[in-house]
């Protein structure tokens, strides 16, 4: 029995994930209960189920396959919401397992250069800080490059993370050339023996052509120092944007060689299912997911835990 004077035990990440995805889960659970309670599995039921999955942002292609899986061999039979939830969790986990991939730092590439892209508002700069915290905790020497030179707040934010993680920060006044800054950062990392360079970039959606050409320029300039760099290019996505995340991946993928995704703001959104649609359409590794403001709220992606949390399976 716990003493009332004691602090409650801290929530596990799964508990935080489950709590964060509660709005996504509630919408899906309500739909399943409404569709499968005291009804036999016929064409109409399956069509409603498929529509519910699409409304939950799981994507049309995956929804069709999943509806087929539930219908398989069960025509005119009754199936409980519990059974459907278990099938749903198993199929989502199976599909997401293919994109569950930790961010690996290749120590033979020093510095290991990570370019981080994403539109304004996704939490990109904060995500860079959290990744820096994780890497420094693992013993890596990290250098941060404040490449979002269009936002003074982003530069200041990265400087704060530099202090928190005891990492060097390369920054220039707002409006400076981002590609030149990235070049200087990689050069400085070589001189100081940094293991990893994390490069922030601008995310101005209102000037997409300029944004994309700037990203291309950063990649070109970095390659002058190391033809194999950047060694990882991550796209940070905001879960609350739902289907819009698909077009963001398309746009960035056409410009830079994306190697992985980070999904933020899964807490408090009803659109958590979009991660399933992204994985199904693009198959890009998902390195991290975020469910809150604290550094510990960004964790490596766990397909089974995510599938269980999304479907409300304990």
Please place each PLM-identified region on the residue numbering.
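Non-catalytic terminal/linker segments enriched in charged/polar, low-complexity residues
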Residues: 1-102, 108-116, 133, 137, ...
């Amino acid at each position: 029995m716990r003493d009332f004077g004691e602090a409650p035990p801290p929530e596990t990440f799964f508990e935080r994930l489950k709590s964060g995805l509660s709005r996504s889960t509630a919408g899906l659970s309500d739909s399943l209960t409404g569709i499968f309670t005291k009804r036999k599995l016929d064409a109409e039921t399956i069509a409603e189920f498929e529509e519910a999955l699409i409304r939950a942002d799981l994507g049309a292609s995956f929804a069709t396959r999943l509806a087929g899986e539930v219908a398989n061999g069960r025509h005119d039979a009754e199936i409980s919401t519990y059974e459907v939830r278990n099938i749903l969790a198993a199929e989502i986990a199976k599909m997401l397992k293919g994109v569950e991939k930790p961010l690996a730092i290749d120590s033979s590439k020093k510095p290991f250069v990570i370019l981080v892209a994403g539109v304004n508002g996704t939490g990109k700069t904060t995500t860079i800080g959290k990744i820096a915290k994780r890497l420094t905790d693992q013993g890596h020497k990290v250098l941060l490059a404040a490449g979002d030179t269009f936002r003074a707040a982003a530069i200041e934010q990265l400087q704060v993370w530099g202090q928190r993680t005891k990492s060097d920060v390369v920054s220039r006044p707002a409006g400076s050339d981002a590609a030149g800054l990235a070049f200087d950062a990689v050069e400085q990392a070589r001189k100081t023996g940094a293991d990893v360079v994390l490069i922030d970039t601008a995310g101005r959606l209102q000037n997409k052509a300029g944004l994309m050409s700037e990203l291309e320029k950063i990649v070109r300039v970095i390659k002058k120092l190391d033809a194999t760099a950047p060694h990882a290019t991550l796209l940070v996505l905001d879960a609350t944007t739902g289907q819009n995340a698909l077009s963001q991946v398309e746009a960035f993928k056409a410009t830079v060689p994306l190697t992985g995704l980070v999904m933020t703001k899964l807490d408090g959104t009803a659109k958590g299912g979009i991660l399933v649609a992204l994985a199904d359409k693009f198959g890009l590794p998902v390195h991290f997911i975020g469910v809150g403001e604290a550094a510990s709220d960004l964790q490596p992606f766990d397909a089974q835990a995510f599938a269980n949390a999304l479907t409300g399976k304990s």
